[in-house]
Amino acid sequence: MAQRQVRAEALDKVDPVWARIRGEAEEIMRREPELATLIYSTILHHDSLEAAVVHRVAERLDSPEVSAEMIRQAYADALEAEPSIGEAFRADIVATVDRDPATNRYLEPVLYFKGFHAIQAHRLAHWLWNKGRKDFAYYLQSRSSAAFQTDINPAVRIGRGIFLDHATGLVVGETAVIEDDVSMLQEVTLGGTGKEAGDRHPKIRRGVLIGAGAKILGNIEIGHCARIAAGSVVLKPVPHNTTVAGVPARVIGPNSCSEPSRTMDHLFEDNDG
């Protein structure tokens, strides 16, 4: 028991996110023995957070055409070439727990949240895309769309610290960019305005909050820490630290907080602007 405690303390110093997840998993094993197989196979069987996340996402993407094992091997190649993908896993977990009032455990995104799973599936698809393995990347996009009800083109560049709440109905087009620390809710579209090729999708800068059902169309910039109200249709660039709302969206005024993606504050005063 003492040796196990020493190992846990050492892990907490080296990888506190993974240490916390393992501790939460052990607590579930004690409290919910019916879930022992799930918890052991998904969390406690693995020696790193990367292995646990890869296992969970690969199992959810498993199909008769492309097995979970093949997907795990592709992840292994990606993580060996770009260890920063594992750092993004951690940043997304912390962002999710920090911003979602419905959860306070790091384990929950890994086990249960399809928004987290969809983003991590995209990270592999994007790596494959950049390596010229476009058919495998397209396959993962298609499979992820069926499994998680999200459709993210594998060419899309996505930063870290991303929170995708509920996830259902997210659509992100090929030339879109999503920078670090962005929060998005369900039914968001980052789309084009026609059938022209080239750079035609939105650029979402750091710290932006995009409300449920918002549609942002065209090659326009949403400035850092801007806030897009739920249900808005955005057709023009949005300045940084600004709230827009409506169909079509109009400027309501400056944000009442400097980091809307972290506070998740969707409300604004009727007399703003």
Label each region the model flagged.
Residues 1-143, 259-273:
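Terminal amphipathic alpha-helical/low-complexity segments used for targeting or macromolecular assembly
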